[in-house]
UniProtKB/Swiss-Prot annotation:
Has bactericidal activity. May act as a ligand for C-C chemokine receptor CCR6. Positively regulates the sperm motility and bactericidal activity in a CCR6-dependent manner. Binds to CCR6 and triggers Ca2+ mobilization in the sperm which is important for its motility. The keyword Repeat does not apply. It comes from the Eukaryota. The keyword Oxidoreductase does not apply. SMART domains: DEFSN. One of its GO terms (cellular component) is sperm midpiece. Keywords: Antibiotic, Antimicrobial, Defensin, Disulfide bond, Membrane, Secreted, Signal. GO terms for molecular function: CCR6 chemokine receptor binding; chemoattractant activity; identical protein binding. GO terms for biological process: calcium-mediated signaling; cell chemotaxis; defense response to Gram-negative bacterium; defense response to Gram-positive bacterium; positive regulation of flagellated sperm motility involved in capacitation. Pfam families: Defensin_beta. The gene is DEFB1. It is found in: Secreted; Membrane. This is Beta-defensin 1.
Length: 64
């Protein structure tokens, strides 16, 4: 019975840790950690948007 409880707890820990990867980039530090750069307008053609840096006007862009 203890094994079932341990596996259940481990399952929830794995699920809660994975939820952060679905949220995207929302600040400058996490943008740079994801190998991106902050651009005040649209991303250049050779880059794609992966999030925002300081709100909607500033985009976080990374090479395609």
């Amino acid at each position: 019975m203890r094994l079932h409880h341990l596996l259940l707890v481990l399952f929830f820990v794995v699920l809660s840790a994975g939820s952060g990867f679905t949220q995207g980039v929302r600040n400058r530090l996490s943008c740079h950690r994801n190998k991106g750069v902050c651009v005040p307008s649209r991303c250049p053609r050779h880059m794609r948007q992966i999030g925002t840096c300081r709100g909607p006007p500033v985009k976080c862009c990374r090479k395609k």
